[in-house]
Amino acid sequence: MSKEERPGREEILECQVMWEPDSKKNTQMDRFRAAVGAACGLALENYDDLYRWSVESYSDFWAEFWKFSGIVFSRAYDEVVDTSKGIADVPEWFKGSRLNYAENLLRHKENDRVALYVAREGKEEIVKVTFEELRQEVALFAAAMRKMGVKKGDRVVGYLPNSEHAVEAMLAAASIGAIWSSTSPDFGVNGVLDRFSQIQPKLIFSVEAVVYNGKEHSHMEKLQQVVKGLPDLKKVVVIPYVSSREKIDLSKIPNSVFLDDFLATGTSEQAPQLEFEQLPFSHPLFIMFSSGTTGAPKCMVHSAGGTLIQHLKEHLLHGNMTSSDILLCYTTAGWMMWNWMVSILATGAAMVLYDGSPLVPTPNVLWDLVDRIGITVLVTGAKWLSVLEEKAMKPVETHSLQMLHTILSTGSPLKAQSYEYVYRCIKSSILLGSISGGTDIISCFMGHNFSLPVYKGEIQARNLGMAVEAWNEEGKAVWGESGELVCTKPIPCQPTHFWNDENGSKYRKAYFSKFPGIWAHGDYCRINPKTGGIIMLGRSDGTLNPNGVRFGSSEIYNIVESFEEVEDSLCVPQYNKFREERVILFLKMASGHAFQPDLVKRIRDAIRVGLSARHVPSLILETKGIPYTLNGKKVEVAVKQIIAGKAVEQGGAFSNPETLDLYRDIPELQGF
């Protein structure tokens, strides 16, 4: 095999080792490497050798992993993939095979093993759901869905917290071949309808209220408005989550029913049996949503087979997960990490579903769960680790964390000082893995790896089968320098298509407009030629991503436009030296109106209600002008560069270039 050519500067900042793999431990990655070597007649001495082979011979790699993973199927594949096609051709994977995603997640026959631990803010009790109980519940959900006419290809959606109901409804939909989408209760009406109205769901599951940050938040008024905006709904299933059903009024929601009554429609004298529709590998499983930077969020369709095999690769090989593991991923059902998390059931591992604030009643709430349940893997946001450090929390002194062997960080880049904090104040022997990918691939391009050291400030490595490079503007791979994160070869987890994108133009524009035929992900990164590690440098487009909550500026504009006092607005991110992001909203006032604190408060409140508290900008400032391109587009990226102190090449691209000067040296933006 040829080594990758790595021209460019080799001098990289100090590479401090924070953790090293146990050479005596025979991981699943080790076993897979040995199996590949034996099957293919290769001398693969280490992870680097295995990685290079996996991207150079990607068809063979995925075929070997199919065998290794033990995927359950009813018909074998005829062809792994047509290697004459590139990633922009979106080739079909494992053609001819038949399988079911839900069947693979529910295949483990140790009936008494716990599959789900359900924990909620303000509740002492932890509910345990065994694999057998989970199968029975999924069968009930699926039978009721079939009874109301849900069939293959129909859309079933959840407006739900991170609960057992979301998992059960999703698996039931998948067992039938229906397509699942979900958003979390912190989404406002506009945010939900911007997404769900595009996919015309037949069935929606929701709750009547949630508890967060010590407060109860009623959900019924929002649900009523959402249902009004989804005319294709045949049924609205309401789950009593905070209150008993006697205290919930469904009279204002047409076609609504309580969960128990819905499930009863699918039962007869005998309990329903699980049935798994056998579907093509490429059959749609999830519709995920982009941030909506340039309008309505894009609807990314992810296949059942592609999602399954990619998640199995990450959990089995990169995470070394087994049936003895228990994973807690702090997420909502509106983030791709929820889908990623649920797939661990296919390994036989259990997961903890926590719904609530990670800081209430104390900042130790997740650590308390780690000790109480015996959690082995904790997945959280980089921001949460920073908050713990700011609060001088030292779990190493207050908790045993005996079973915990892995902490994964995602959502935003994990800063170098957080590595030091984790190993000093949490646990010195764990693997701390920063992982990075996105909703677009419903998984990771790079991440944790039990075969490699952890270096301070770096993601350990590019993941198997992911031909990732950093490219400069000329389309050349660069090493040790910042570049656009690209993927050069087909992957089974890329979307099969976008919903409502018949000619594929939105799909091509989203990923292949920067470098023809090459997937450009919209992130800047730097690959260390010495360690193979990756440093993420932030978004390369106008998407907003504060604390891992990714959304588009147009979602903010849609709210602000309703205020008659505002003529125009511009929403951009600002980064500090740690690559933490905050959102700045600039308002250009309409004639005869003044910029007032009361207006700022009303806009903040409207964004919180219409979208979520996480969408509210950190600062709202007045501006006298907003730059536009000649073809009438707001110029967000240039303003982002200016407030970061970078030079902007004006050229002839702007219709009003003089407005750019308004964004230089703004006092309120200094010192972040």
From Swiss-Prot:
Top-rank taxon: Eukaryota
Gene Ontology molecular functions: acetoacetate-CoA ligase activity; ATP binding
InterPro entries with a match to the protein in the record: Acac_CoA_synth, ACAS_N, AMP-bd_C_sf, AMP-binding_CS, AMP-dep_synth/lig_dom, ANL_N_sf
Enzyme Commission designation: 6.2.1.16
A single GO BP: positive regulation of insulin secretion
Cytoplasm found in the keyword field: yes
The entry's keywords: ATP-binding, Cytoplasm, Fatty acid metabolism, Ligase, Lipid metabolism, Nucleotide-binding
Reaction equation(s) it catalyzes: acetoacetate + ATP + CoA = acetoacetyl-CoA + AMP + diphosphate
Cross-referenced Pfam families: ACAS_N, AMP-binding
Role this protein plays: Converts acetoacetate to acetoacetyl-CoA in the cytosol. Ketone body-utilizing enzyme, responsible for the synthesis of cholesterol and fatty acids.
Family the entry assigns: Belongs to the ATP-dependent AMP-binding enzyme family.
Protein name as annotated: Acetoacetyl-CoA synthetase
Organism whose genome encodes this protein: Macaca fascicularis
Gene name, Swiss-Prot/TrEMBL: AACS
